[in-house]
Curated annotation (Swiss-Prot):
Protein name as catalogued: Kinesin-like protein KIN-12B
Residue ranges the record marks as coiled coil: 932-1003, 1062-1130, 1167-1241
Domain named Kinesin motor: residues: 96-431
Disulfide-linked positions: none
Family to which the UniProt record says this protein belongs: Belongs to the TRAFAC class myosin-kinesin ATPase superfamily. Kinesin family. KIN-12 subfamily.
GO molecular function terms noted in the UniProt entry: ATP binding; microtubule binding; microtubule motor activity
Region of interest (Microtubules-binding), residue spans: 298-302, 331-337, 380-384
Disrupted-gene phenotype: No visible phenotype. Kin12a and kin12b double mutant display defective pollen grains leading to the production of fewer seeds.
Subunit structure: Homodimer and heterodimer with KIN12A. Interacts with TIO.
Functional note: Plus-end directed kinesin-like motor enzyme that plays a critical role in the organization of phragmoplast microtubules during cytokinesis. Constitutes a signaling module in association with serine/threonine-protein kinase TIO that is required to support phragmoplast expansion and cell-plate growth in plant cells.
Biased composition (Polar residues): 17-26, 699-708
Subcellular location: Cytoplasm, Cytoskeleton, Phragmoplast
Organism of this sequence: Arabidopsis thaliana
Cross-referenced Gene3D superfamilies: Kinesin motor domain
């Protein structure tokens, strides 16, 4: 049994890959055989595929490159796929590493100790050992010679499209930095042309000169170059951006297309040598350097300067365009050093350790690459051991030309380091790099134009045949024959494969080796003959029939790429690849899907093919009629991946009948095969609404009044924003009318803007009220001049003379003629209010010119003030109307947002229903036709909703509101600051009020000086009764004191009236303040509502995103299931074919079928387990790395804990010592205190025991009489004197008692301890 099954495993794949006399079969099989290791890799040109006849007759091995080692598969992938990605023949350069050894000039004391000697241009000796390299530069060599050896070839390689790298290696102080960059000031502008310049400025000087020369030389090809540079350093295994030192500890990433790169690294474009010099100066200034005993400015880090040169050229003659990329890496490595020679300590010692470790890892990598190049034996390449090797892996054994400048010191003191450097250079010279030209050639434009022209002719011919012969009975056969011919035309142009697809990971793909000897041996054991040629011919015929029934898809190029990206990832055998064509800008975007149902190996059924193709093409031609054009939506409108803005194109396609006639039918009318799963349409991606270009312009006239502006605002806003468009369906109109009855739709204006506008409105209201209150108080002191009645000059106190009823009637008539009804009503109310509150009247008796002039000026000024107040009141009402309209618009936007939210909920429900339908279709519950009908109805309903949301988008209304408000503000500013605007009127009113006040002040002062009181203040008890006028005699009989007292009483009453008026104003101010607080609370409520709406919208968007992710996971699982089923079926078919060829029949055939099914299931299960174990291995490796990092962090933390514990123990010990010392000090103080108290008590006892002082006794004996009187007082004085002498001791006793208590600094010391 074992011998029976083993050969079968080798023929599970392509049993028909043996030699076939049929050339078409050989061509198709060779195409499958030469397929790249990448599933998504673009196939090479069909005309350039030549079968490989170098394989042995025993085994036909796959021409795929050998699988890369498991350590770094990506490195080898990039090299293996370079040819396939470019699409053209790429020049390959198989060259080794170029090594140049440069000897440092010896110092004065080292001239006699030189141990390195140059014996030829490419050889040197050290300790009687000879080393051979590409070139040797002796100590007398100049910078220009090094440039000619390394820099000039590097520039030419860069222009040719190769990647190039230059490494500077050697011990510290050997001249690496000088070779690469030159002296410290060599990069400045004044030193750019000196002889001491380094390799880098010379390289780029030549590079920019050659770029200019090439551009001028190939100007007809539109050749353009572009250079971008980056500069980084690797210090202590951390990458820092030298152009932006704030970017530290950058991470290295790896990508299939771009390879290895540093994340977030700064790249700057340069155009000339001056720009590049600035970058070099800036980067080298930020590089880490330090002083050692060997080198005063030793580099403490590796630095890498990278320049990417991109060129693009296009040939006008043949339409070919090429894109060439080359990368230049200039690497200045830190020098190796020994602690004995450099005397490094502290940070320098740590840096030296990291540098030596990094160089050791580089040397290990060089050894492995040299061994691989010499022996050809594959082994693990440790690129990831250090940041330097991981970053520069393309330069070391990859796609680059490498030149290495090894700097050595010929002195005896550096013998070991020099010898180590030369051995490193010798091993590096053995490395073999494979540099290729990084060039991408695009397809021939003229060829594609010819293809498009022929395809157009074919399509037009098919349409003409169908239109000219509508009743021809042979039309179905002709149509199917035309479809076959069109398919052959497409295949002849080579459009059956995608032009370019991204490369995928080929991990897990295995290519089987088909052993023909084992097949023949199996046939001999079973007594069967080998496969005959007639079977091969039959298989070729079946292959032809299957290939002729492929699906023809005409789509947009971008959508085709994205579709093939997902579909080709699931196909194992690309037998049924989609045919693709490229469209010009005016070509169709829709798709025609034609597919037939047919079992493998069966004959062709012309009737089914004819019927299906006939139905598809007839549906296509029916789209020419304008009446049905509206019922056939374009594929662009039904494909969910399209932009939301493209949905509006339904109306355009309904009017454009020519476009509808060209476009094929939508995918919902296509016939899908039974054996192929239906194409799953992904859900709509949620896109936040964005304001594009507003085509509405709201213009206001500067001469329109407030009422006219209100009317225009109401007329403009309603029809443009609120009314639905005629293209909306009846259902959407009903829904819109139901929603419009509640509140207006609104989209919230930004919170800060709304708050600012309301705050500005409140300020205007406050200023208006304050100015109104001030004007009212001024009016009430204007002595009845507010009625706009002309004043009369009176010489006598005659009441009848002063009333002037005719003048009053004339004034009233004039006011009626000038003022409108609204202003007249407001003026009458103000006049009535003023008449109610005013109690003062002016009774002029002087006939002088000043009095007459002032009496006529007063009414004019008051009229102007009154007109200004009315005008400002109207402006405020207009402002309030604007605010009310804005509030209504905001409410309308809120309602509209609610409607959009409901539409989103409906769309989400549609997505869920779609998922349910897909699951039902997969389970077989729902038939394919029902699924297509329900899907079409769902898409049409969703299209209506999206169209409704597009036509009534909230942000459109918001934009209009913003534009209207800005225009109104601009208009108000123009009206205020313009000629004869509000500003001029206000200035004129202020001037009139000042003149009026000055008039009253002057008249009152002059009358008081001449005749005393000229004002007669009367008080009216009845508000409606006119105040009485009293005559004032010419001569004053009463005394001045009585007159003054009367005037004082009158002014006191007037002052009380003013106080009551002030109280009323204060009450009104409080009311307004309460109203403002209420409005502020309402504003806060609106803000909270807006925030809640925003949060709800965000939650809805997040839910929609989660729904899309779930659908994507479901679709991925579905695709995986289909791929697994397809692989099982292919395995069964292969085994059936092998059994049919071997002639197995009857029971053996059933056994073979069962065995094939089991083998296929086991194979799929094994692949699944392999993928599972691979993923688990990766996860375990990542967990292991995380665990190692955690263990390292825990070790560091444990060390810190131990240090902290030692510090704590030491602190506790110090605290105990301090407490012991403090207790001892307390004991000493107590002891001293007791001793002192004992001494004090002894002295007091001795003092009390002695009766008197000896001196006093002698005086008493001399003067008995005198001392008899003063005996007792002298004794008391002596006692007091002794007490005074001992008083300091008592004070010290008190201080000691104080010291006995715990001092303030004892606790402080404890805290510090």
């Amino acid at each position: 049994m074992k011998h029976f099954m083993m050969p079968r495993n080798a023929i599970l794949r392509d049993i028909g890959e043996s030699q076939s006399p049929n050339p078409s079969l050989t061509k198709s099989k060779s195409q499958r055989k030469i397929k790249s290791s990448k599933e998504n890799a673009p196939p090479p040109d069909l005309n350039s595929l030549i079968p490989d006849h170098r394989s042995s007759p025993a085994k036909l091995k796959s021409p795929l490159p050998p699988r890369p080692p498991s350590s770094n598969p990506l490195k080898r992938k990039l090299i293996a796929e370079a040819t396939a990605d470019n699409g053209v023949a790429i020049g390959v350069s198989d060259s080794g590493v170029k090594v140049i050894v440069r000897m440092k000039p010896p110092s004065k004391g080292e001239e006699e100790e030189m141990i390195v000697k140059k014996i030829s241009n490419d050889a040197l000796t050290i300790n009687e050992q000879t080393f051979t390299f590409d070139s040797i530069a002796d100590p007398e060599s100049t910078q220009d010679e090094i440039f000619q050896l390394v820099g000039a070839p590097l520039v030419e390689n860069c222009l040719a499209g190769f990647n190039s790298s230059v490494f500077a290696y050697g011990q510290t102080g050997s001249g690496k930095t000088y070779t690469m960059w030159g002296p410290a000031n060599g990069l400045l502008e004044e030193h750019l042309s000196g002889d001491q310049r380094g390799l880098t400025p010379r390289v780029f000087e030549l590079l920019f000169a050659r770029l200019s020369e090439e551009q001028a030389k190939h100007a007809e090809r539109q050749l353009k170059y572009q250079c971008r540079c980056s500069f980084l350093e690797i210090y202590n295994e951390q990458i820092t951006d030298l152009l932006d030192p704030s970017l530290k500890n950058l991470m290295i990433r790896e990508d299939v297309k771009s390879g290895v790169y540093v994340e977030n690294l700064t790249e700057e474009y340069v155009k000339n040598l001056k720009d590049l010099s600035k970058l070099l100066v800036k980067g080298l200034a930020n590089r880490r350097t330090g002083a050692t005993s060997v080198n005063a400015e030793s580099s403490r880090s590796h630095c890498v300067f990278t320049c990417v040169v991109e060129s693009h050229c296009k040939s006008v003659a043949d339409g070919l365009s090429s894109f060439k990329t080359s990368r230049i890496n200039l690497v200045d490595l830190a020098g190796s050093e020994r602690q004995k020679l450099t005397g490094a300590a502290g940070d320098r010692l740590k840096e030296a350790g990291n540098i030596n470790r990094s160089l050791s890892q580089l040397g290990n990598l060089i050894n492995i690459l040299a061994e691989i190049s010499q022996t050809g034996k594959q082994r693990h390449i440790p690129y990831r051991d250090s940041r330097l090797t991981f970053l520069l892996q393309e330069s070391l054994g990859g796609n680059a030309k490498l030149a290495m400048v090894c700097a050595v010191s010929p002195s005896q003191s550096c013998r070991s380091e020099t010898f180590s450097t030369l051995r490193f250079a010798q091993r590096a010279k053995a490395i073999q790099n494979k540099a290729i030209v990084n060039e991408v050639m695009q397809d021939d434009v003229n060829f594609l134009r010819e293809v498009i022209r022929q395809l157009r002719d074919e399509l037009q011919r098919v349409k003409d045949d169908k239109g000219n012969n509508p009743t021809n009975p042979n039309a179905a056969y002709t149509t199917s024959w035309n479809a076959r011919r069109s398919l052959s035309l497409l295949r002849s142009f080579g459009l059956g494969h995608p032009k370019s697809l991204p490369n995928g990971d080929d991990d897990g793909d295995t290519e089987m080796e088909i052993d023909e000897e084992a097949v023949e041996r199996l046939c001999a054991q079973m007594g069967l003959s080998p496969p005959a040629e007639d079977n091969n011919q039959e298989m070729s015929r079946v292959e032809k029939i299957n290939s002729s029934l492929q699906t023809v898809v005409l789509k947009d190029e971008s959508y085709n790429n994205s579709h093939l990206k997902s579909s080709e990832a699931t196909d194992v055998n690309m037998e049924d690849a989609c045919c693709q064509t490229e469209n010009n800008g005016s070509e169709t975007d829709n798709a025609l899907t034609v597919a037939e149902t047919m079992d493998d190996g069966s004959s062709v059924q012309p009737d089914s093919i004819t019927n299906s193709l006939h139905s598809c093409i007839s549906d296509t031609n029916q789209g020419n009629s304008p009446s049905k054009a509206e019922n056939i939506p374009s594929c662009q409108d039904l494909v969910i991946e399209a932009d939301v803005s493209a949905i509006v194109s339904v109306a355009d396609t309904s009017n454009n009948t020519e476009q509808v006639s060209v476009n094929p039918v939508s995918p919902c009318l296509s016939v899908a095969p039974v054996s192929v799963s239906p194409v799953l349409i992904p859900p709509t991606e949620s896109a936040s609404p964005k304001i594009r270009n507003s085509r509405k312009s709201l213009r206001t006239t500067s001469m329109s009044t407030a009422s006219q502006k209100d009317i225009e605002r109401a007329n403009q806003l309603t029809p443009e924003v609120v009314e639905p468009s005629p293209a909306m369906s009846t259902e959407v109109l009903n829904l819109y009318s139901a929603l419009s009855t509640k509140k207006s739709e609104a989209f919230p204006v930004p919170t800060r803007q709304l708050a600012a506008s309301l705050h500005r409105g409140m300020k205007l209201l406050d200023s208006y009220r304050q100015s109104t209150a001030l004007r009212r108080s001024t009016f009430r002191l204007s002595y009845k001049a507010l009625e706009c009645k002309p004043s009369t000059v009176l010489s006598k106190a005659d009441v009848g003379v002063q009333t002037y009823p005719q003048a009053d009637e004339i004034a009233e008539d004039n006011s009626k003629e000038v003022l409108c009804s609204r202003c007249k009503c407001r003026a009458e109310c103000d006049a009535q209010e003023i008449s109610d509150t005013s109690n003062l009247q002016l009774v002029p008796i002087d006939n002088s010119e000043g009095s007459e002039k002032s009496n006529f000026q007063v009414p004019k000024a008051v009229e102007k003030v009154l007109a200004g107040s009315i005008r400002r009141e109207m402006a405020m009402e207009e402002f309030c109307t604007k605010q009310a309209s804005e509030i209504s618009q905001l409410n309308r936007l809120v309602q509209q947002y609610k409607h959009e939210r409901e539409c989103n909920a409906i769309i989400g429900q549609t997505r869920e229903d779609k998922i349910v339908r897909l699951e039902s279709l997969m389970d077989g519950v729902l038939s394919k036709d029902d699924f297509l009908d329900e899907e079409f109805a769902s898409l049409m309903h969703e299209h209506k909703l999206l169209k409704d949301m597009y036509e009534n988008h909230p942000e459109v209304l918001q934009t209009r509101i913003e534009l209207k408000r800005v225009q109104e503000e601009l208009e108000s500013f123009k009206n205020f600051y313009g000629d004869m605007g509000e500003r001029e009127v206000l200035l004129e009113e202020i001037h009139d009020l000042k003149a009026q006040l000055q008039c009253y002040t002057d008249s009152s002062l002059t009358s008081a000086r001449r005749r005393g009181s000229l004002l007669k203040l009367t008080y009216a008890c009845d508000p409606n009764q006119a105040p009485q006028l009293n005559t004032i005699p010419e001569s004053v009989d009463e005394g001045p004191e009585k007159t003054l007292e009367q005037e004082r009483l009158r002014w006191t009453e007037a002052e009380s009236n003013w106080i009551s008026l002030a109280e009323e104003l204060r009450t009104e101010l409080d009311t307004n303040r309460l109203l403002m607080e209420k409005q502020k609370r309402e504003l806060d409520t609106e803000k909270r509502c807006a925030e809640e709406l925003t949060e709800a919208m965000q939650m809805a968007m997040q839910g929609h995103a989660r729904m899309i992710e779930q659908y994507a996971d479901l679709e991925e699982k579905h695709i995986q299931l289909l791929a697994r089923h397809r692989r099982i079926r292919e395995g069964i078919d292969d085994v059936k074919k092998a059994a049919a060829r071997a002639g197995v029949k009857g029971a053996e055939s059933r056994f073979i079928n069962a065995l094939a099914a089991e083998i296929s299931a086991l194979k799929v299960q094994r692949e699944k387990e392999v993928r599972y174990f691979r993923d688990e291995n990766k996860s375990l490796q990542s967990q292991l790395r995380d665990t190692a990092e955690a263990v390292q962090a825990a070790g560091e933390l444990l060390v810190r804990f131990k240090e902290a514990e030692e510090g704590l123990t030491f602190a506790q010990k110090r605290a105990m010592d301090a407490e012991y010392e403090a207790s001892e000090a307390y004991k000493k103080v107590d002891k001293l205190k007791r001793k002192y108290e004992t001494e004090i008590s002894t002295v007091n006892q001795q003092h009390n025991a002695e009766p008197q002082n000896p001196i006093e006794s002698l005086q008493a004996s001399c003067n008995d009489d005198a001392m008899a009187k003063y005996d007792e007082p002298s004794a008391s004085d002596g006692d007091n004197q002794w007490r005074e002498e001992f008083q300091p001791f008592y004070k010290k006793d008190e201080e000691l008692s104080k010291l006995a208590e715990p001092s303030w600094f004892s606790g402080y010391d404890r805290c510090n301890i």
